[in-house]
């Protein structure tokens, strides 16, 4: 079962998937290095890890990212052609949304259309609608509330219910 509540609660360690980001980074490093070698160019790779993840997920911390990148460089020829970008390492979900809002505007994209196509929920229903009680959903809704926007994804019981649930939950933090 996926625990419900805020990431500040002790039970959120149950959401940890051991070495998850190491697995992701190993795959993206291998692909990036292959592209760099075949095309003879440098490749930047980005990871969306953010400060909200640090307390629960050890592989989202700067120390882990540095150690992972150093191991990658030590273990591969031409690894210096691949650079890591972690633009949100010290930001939260709100800063990601704020950045997304800026770039959607700058690029002429419809913010709601872009974010309607994303899913943060750990417990979507069979129709793909987001829950609003798991920590990932709570954190997302909290960021949208801070941004002053309605989240365009569809929630199981609707936005009003999801918003009210998170507002009540946040009174405890």
List each language-model region with its residue ranges.
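Nucleotide-activated chemistry modules centered on ATP-dependent adenylation/adenylyltransferase
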Residues: 1-173
